């Protein structure tokens, strides 16, 4: 093989190997940052992993908010109309957090079925609902009830449909 061709081949192979390594590292980093969304029904049915960070969303059950007297610990229940999941959070809740409103919590699911959230996102206006929560309510057949309650002036959602 001609020395010039051999040198070109080595350079091309080095470039291909470098690009391959860069793509591999990028895909690995992206995979670690993926937070899949799970509904309370999926979490209650055991479909959500307990060892990775997930997003869970739904409507905050009326009367479920429990605040600690001596710390920033908060517990509340989120529902999609079919099942419920308890969320534990340490920190200051967003200003727009209210019972009966849609939220998305990011955290890890404990072995006891409680989602330990490190971030809670509240919807930003009265009519907005996260797309994942809307889909979960639609799938459980509770979206129309929620919308009818909002049209009638209700400010909260309960599972019995009253």
Swiss-Prot record:
Residues 1-8 are cytoplasmic. Gene3D superfamilies: Nucleic acid-binding proteins. Signal peptide: none annotated. GO terms for cellular component: plasma membrane. It holds the Pfam family CcmE. GO terms for biological process: cytochrome complex assembly. The keyword Heme applies. Residues 30-162 are periplasmic. Keywords: Cell inner membrane, Cell membrane, Cytochrome c-type biogenesis, Heme, Iron, Membrane, Metal-binding, Signal-anchor, Transmembrane, Transmembrane helix. Its main location: membrane. It is found in: Cell inner membrane. The chain crosses the membrane at residues 9-29. Residues 139-148 have a biased composition (Basic and acidic residues). Heme binds at residues 124, 128. One of its GO terms (molecular function) is metal ion binding. Residues 139-162 are annotated as: Disordered. InterPro entries: CcmE, CcmE-like_sf, NA-bd_OB-fold. It is a single-pass type II membrane protein. Heme chaperone required for the biogenesis of c-type cytochromes. Transiently binds heme delivered by CcmC and transfers the heme to apo-cytochromes in a process facilitated by CcmF and CcmH. Belongs to the CcmE/CycJ family. This is Cytochrome c-type biogenesis protein CcmE. It comes from Pseudomonas aeruginosa (strain ATCC 15692 / DSM 22644 / CIP 104116 / JCM 14847 / LMG 12228 / 1C / PRS 101 / PAO1). The gene is ccmE.
């Amino acid at each position: 093989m001609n020395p010039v061709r051999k040198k070109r081949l080595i350079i091309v192979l080095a470039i291909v190997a470098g690009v391959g390594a860069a793509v591999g590292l990028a895909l690995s980093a992206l995979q670690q940052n993926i937070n899949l969304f799970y509904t309370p029904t999926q979490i209650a049915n055991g479909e959500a992993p307990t060892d990775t960070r997930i997003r869970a969303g739904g409507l905050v059950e009326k009367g479920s908010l429990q605040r600690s007297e001596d710390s920033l610990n908060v517990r509340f229940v989120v529902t999609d109309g079919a099942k419920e999941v308890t969320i534990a959070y340490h920190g200051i809740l967003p200003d727009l957090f209210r019972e009966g409103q849609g939220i998305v919590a990011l955290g890890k699911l404990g072995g006891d079925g409680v989602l330990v959230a490190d971030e809670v996102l509240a919807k930003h206006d009265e009519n907005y609902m996260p797309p994942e929560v809307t889909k979960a309510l639609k799938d459980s057949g509770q979206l129309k009830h929620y919308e009818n309650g909002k049209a009638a002036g209700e400010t909260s959602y309960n599972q019995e449909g009253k």
